[in-house]
């Protein structure tokens, strides 16, 4: 039976981990699978999953699209804050143009195969201290963002500390 190594960066409660476990359950009759569900517990950064996959240390991984910006700059489209009106608009972009383009770029330039995109949910800005009503409400609030330089710049411009 062929070996298959899968790695991720989330714990048991994560929808990502649960999805990978669902996938493993569906293909476990065909592969001898090992799953390192959270490499960050071992001091590795989530972003290292890309190179681990490129180097065949693992064969399957998942990551937020922002991590791929240095490999496919066009993927920043998915990180444009406040750009898309709704999820259907994003899904249309992915299904009609972006997925095919990203697939080709990954395989031809990076020896990676895209299995698909999944919805990682909408991003909301909230705080347990105050109501955010306008950009002034954001001044000097700490915010955790994706690794996207675009997100960091936009939120800093709004007054957040990222």
Model-derived segments and spans:
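Hydrophobic alpha-helical packing residues
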Residues: 27-28, 155
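Acidic helix-start/capping segments at beta-turn-to-alpha-helix junctions
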Residues: 37-45, 49
């Amino acid at each position: 039976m062929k070996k298959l190594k899968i790695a991720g960066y989330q714990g048991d409660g994560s929808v990502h981990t649960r999805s990978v476990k669902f996938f493993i359950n569906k293909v476990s009759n065909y592969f001898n699978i090992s799953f390192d569900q959270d490499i960050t517990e071992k001091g590795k950064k989530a972003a290292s999953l890309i190179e681990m996959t490129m180097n065949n240390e693992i064969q399957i991984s998942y990551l937020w699209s922002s991590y791929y910006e240095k490999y496919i700059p066009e993927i920043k489209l998915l990180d444009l804050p406040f750009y898309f009106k709704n999820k259907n608009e994003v899904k249309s972009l992915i299904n009609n143009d972006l997925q095919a383009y990203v697939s080709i770029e990954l395989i031809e330039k990076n020896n990676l195969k895209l299995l698909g995109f999944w919805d990682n949910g909408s991003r909301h800005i909230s705080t347990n201290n105050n109501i955010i009503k306008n950009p002034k409400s954001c001044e000097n609030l700490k915010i955790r963002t994706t690794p996207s330089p675009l997100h960091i710049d936009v939120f800093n411009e709004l007054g957040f500390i990222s």
